[in-house]
């Protein structure tokens, strides 16, 4: 008889404020919520919420991912977040609005999109 795997329930930490990182790429949107020191409290992405393929890059998918991450973070007692947005994707604004709509108070908003000072050669232009 095989041993039964016991799923250990995550302990509820009391974290009143944290940092929300929204990474919006052209293909997906990933929302990670951490405590002020950087330890991950909750995370979600458009793929985790149930979207596949090109539907992951939609604003609606980003909205659901942000709501999912916010709900998980609020279970740990989080109320206030600083938001760092990275990337050029279509889910930037909708993910931010979803965090506010889920009940998190946005204290600060900062764009941390990396801009090269003429670093690596970019990928070739798409011709459609």
UniProtKB/Swiss-Prot annotation:
The entry's cellular-component GO terms read: ribonucleoprotein complex; ribosome
Q: Acetylation among the record's keywords?
A: no
Q: Which residues form the signal peptide?
A: none
Choose any GO biological process term that the UniProt entry carries and state it: translation
Q: Which domain of life is it from?
A: Bacteria
Q: Name one Pfam family in it.
A: Ribosomal_S11
Q: Which GO terms describe its molecular function?
A: rRNA binding; structural constituent of ribosome
Is ATP-binding tagged as a keyword?
no
SUPFAM superfamilies in UniProt? Translational machinery components (SSF53137)
Q: Which UniProt keywords apply?
A: Ribonucleoprotein, Ribosomal protein, RNA-binding, rRNA-binding
Query: Self-association or partners: how does it assemble?
Result: Part of the 30S ribosomal subunit. Interacts with proteins S7 and S18. Binds to IF-3.
What is the purpose of this protein? Located on the platform of the 30S subunit, it bridges several disparate RNA helices of the 16S rRNA. Forms part of the Shine-Dalgarno cleft in the 70S ribosome.
Could you tell me which NCBIfam families the record lists for this protein?
PRK05309.1, uS11_bact
Say which family it is in.
Belongs to the universal ribosomal protein uS11 family.
Q: What is this protein called?
A: Small ribosomal subunit protein uS11
- The organism named in the record is Desulfatibacillum aliphaticivorans
């Amino acid at each position: 008889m095989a041993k039964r795997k016991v799923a250990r329930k995550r302990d509820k930490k009391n974290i009143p404020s944290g940092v929300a990182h929204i990474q919006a790429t052209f293909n997906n949107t990933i929302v990670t919520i951490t405590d002020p020191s950087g330890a991950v409290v909750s995370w979600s992405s458009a793929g985790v919420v149930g979207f596949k393929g090109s539907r992951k890059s939609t604003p609606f998918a980003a909205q659901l991912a942000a709501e999912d991450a916010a709900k998980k973070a609020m279970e740990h007692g989080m109320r206030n977040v600083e938001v760092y947005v990275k990337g050029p994707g279509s889910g930037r604004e909708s993910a931010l609005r979803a965090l506010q709509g889920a009940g998190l108070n946005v204290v600060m908003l900062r764009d941390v999109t990396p801009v090269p000072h003429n670093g690596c050669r970019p990928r070739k232009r798409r011709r459609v």
